[in-house]
Design a protein with these regions (language model features):
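N-terminal export signals
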Residues: 1-2, 6-29
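Structured beta-strand/loop patches that form or line metal/cofactor-binding pockets in enzymes
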Residues: 31-92, 364, 368
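Flexible C-terminal active-site loop/helix
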Residues: 10, 35-49, 64, 337-407
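Alpha/beta enzyme core
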Residues: 189-198, 244-251
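Active-site mouth loops of central-metabolism enzymes
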Residues: 173-185, 206, 281
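Metal- or metallocofactor-binding catalytic centers and their adjacent structured scaffolds
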Residues: 34, 39-43, 75-157
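Catalytic core of soluble alpha/beta enzymes
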Residues: 203-342, 371
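Conserved, mostly hydrophobic/aromatic
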Residues: 79, 146, 159, 231, ...
Length: 407
């Protein structure tokens, strides 16, 4: 049975490559215009958090403290502009804002010069040859920003939204899941009541079983109508995890439990899966489609958490989704408190997939400014754009006003 699953996964991976190549070939009409990228600008930007955001590995955002993003502006010789962006969360993954800027300016952006916007397969190949993947993938956050700019350009030059470059959307709107930062039980209960339009929350837990159970009780009493997606962000040790898992059946509104153990400990995740009353999801331990395939062979999890930055871009993230589905793994969508450009890239991608829960894209929840114009959102529901490219505009003057000074 496992052999068949592996073969099917490999076949689907090959199909994913073929589909992507086919789109590049089909873009010849716009390509014949001769529009080639002549300039790539890298812009580090700070955007303040409204409130603190604490997860299992520590604080990833503080009130009034700028979160650090990197925007990419790619301009063609006929004046078309494509935007890309990525977040940086070095206590979640290793790419600092300085590393992303340096990688883009010195290694990746030069690879884009002289290319058309439709050569993203060539771009990905050259990026992986320049910054070689090690075990999983290499410098994925930086690569993601540049690929999004290519896709935005390709969409604008063909008059198509990004979701159509991926085969078209399955959903016209996307309901969002918001996050509940680790805090005292009463404060976490107040947070879920603060967003009445949101019906699904990713509840962050700390690795302290007794405190986490008290938090869950408080949240469940405050909003018995919600669905809970648990996320430990690698914070649990084996003995505490066993106690926590044993107590979880008390809560009937939990749908899954994400990354309870360290990202490197796949066998520990498999052991936790055997004892968990709810499906287990892998996130920090699964960056690439190769990771998905290995995890499926180990039977280490039930669900895969997709993130555009950790995958190295939209098309690599889509490839991970294909491999996961081919191996019988459910799909969850998430982000890293993405600001507007990378947030919208995820919206386009997730509109083409059948996710098991609303994607956890919490930028509108935590950030004081999404740094885009034209996003349509009511309550916790985003309309998937049908305008070309990302379907939004970037307020460039505001972006430059919030430029970070590095070094």
């Amino acid at each position: 049975m496992k052999t068949d699953r592996r073969r099917f996964g490999l076949a689907m991976t090959a199909g994913g490559f073929a589909m992507s190549s086919g789109w590049a070939a089909g873009a010849s009409a716009a390509d014949s215009k001769g529009a080639r990228i002549r300039k790539v600008e890298v812009i580090p930007v700070g955007i303040e958090f409204r409130t603190a955001f604490n997860i299992g590995v520590g604080q990833v955002g503080g009130k009034g403290v700028p979160a650090k993003y990197v925007y990419v502006k790619a301009t063609t010789d006929d004046g078309h502009v494509g935007w890309g962006a990525t977040t940086t969360v070095p206590n979640w993954s290793y790419e600092t804002v300085e590393a992303v800027v340096g990688t883009l300016e010195h290694h990746l952006a030069p690879l884009a010069i002289g290319r058309t916007a439709f050569e993203w397969n060539v771009l990905k190949k050259r990026m992986d040859e320049t910054i070689r993947p090690a075990v999983s993938n290499g410098a994925p956050f930086a690569k993601s920003a540049l690929e999004i700019a290519f896709l935005d350009l390709a969409g604008k030059m063909t008059g198509q939204p990004i979701h159509r470059l991926l085969g078209g959307k399955l959903h016209d709107t996307i309901d969002l899941c918001y996050a509940v930062s680790i805090d005292e039980p009463q404060a976490m209960a107040a947070e879920v009541k603060r967003w009445p339009a949101c019906r699904c929350f990713k509840v962050k837990v700390s690795g302290d079983a007794d405190k986490d159970l008290a938090r869950l009780r408080s949240i469940s009493e405050a909003r018995p109508d919600i669905v809970i997606w648990l996320d430990a962000n690698q914070s649990y040790q084996p003995i505490a995890l066993e106690r926590f898992l044993h107590a979880l059946p008390e809560f009937k509104n939990i749908r899954c439990f994400e990354q309870p153990v360290r990202s490197e400990d796949w066998m520990g995740l498999a052991r936790a899966r055997a004892k968990s009353p709810y499906p287990l999801a892998i996130d920090e331990g699964c960056f690439s489609s190769f990771d998905v395939a290995r995890m499926a062979r180990l039977d280490a999890a039930d669900l895969v958490v997709l993130k555009v930055p950790k995958s190295g871009g939209v098309t690599n993230c889509y490839k991970s989704a294909v491999v996961a589905e081919a191996n019988g793994l459910g799909l969850l969508g998430s982000g890293l408190t993405d600001a507007g450009v990378s947030f919208m890239a995820a919206i386009h991608l997730y509109s083409t997939l059948d996710l098991l829960l609303p994607p956890e894209l919490n930028g509108p929840q935590f950030l004081t400014d999404m740094m885009i114009d034209g996003m349509e959102m009511q309550g916790a529901t985003v309309t998937v754009p049908d305008k070309p490219g990302l379907g939004i505009t970037v307020p460039e003057e505001k972006l430059r006003e919030n430029r970070l000074k590095l070094g």
